[in-house]
Every structure is written in structure tokens, then in C-alpha cells.
Amino acid sequence: SYGAVPFDLAAGTEQWWSIDSSDSAYWAVQENINAIRAAAGLSPLAMDGGLSAAADARCESFVAGGAFDHSGMTTRSEICAAGPIGSASSVCSYWQNSPAHYANITNASFTSMGVGCWFCSTAEGQYTYWTVTFN
């Protein structure tokens, strides 16, 4: 169940959708993150609704034209990605192969996580914002 949220972007009006806990991609991110942690000998992270709300809000701010950086972060830590990254496994693979993102994923002090994802399909292809928040 995707909720269509239209935004007037610089390139024109695009139709954006966000995922939530009813979507398999939401849980696939957690599964992939926890597999990366397990390979590093770490405990799995529990999904947290408040952290997911924060991750979703970060993605929404990117869609609305906010700076794509970590300023204004409201959680202990976050990882973000943007571009034509259409699947949970693809974005998690990207994060796993980035030393800074991998360091966040494998931070042993984290016990919970949240997931946000907003995407748009255009004539040029799919564009996606992903955020995972940690605590």
C-alpha cells in the first residue's frame, strides 16, 4: 500500500510514494542490515516505529528540496542514499561497501533502527531516497 504524495519539484510535478511497515521493502532493509551485522558478529537490530517515522520524515524533506546531507538529524545516527537504487538489497549492498555507512551499520552500541523510503518513477527512470536511522 503506497500513499501517493505529489510534490511540485523544479523539474515539474512528480508523483512520489513512500513505503511503510506494510511493504516488503521496509522489512527487507531490516533483514539485509541484520545480515550485515550478523556477519560482523553483532546482534540484530529491532525495528522501531519512532525511528521509522524519523527516517520517513528525512526522505520527505529530501523530496521537498531539503539539503541531501545529515544536518538536522534528529536521531543518534543515520545513513542515507539517493538515486536510481530501486531495491532494498541494492541500497544495503551500497551501504555495506561504503566504509562510513558500514561503520554505522556495524556500530555495536545500536539496538534499534527505522526505515524510510520515497520513490518516483519518471520517463528517465526511478529515483529513490532511502534513510535508515539508528539508536
Predicted regions and their residues:
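Functional surface patches built around histidine and acidic residues
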Residues: 1-135
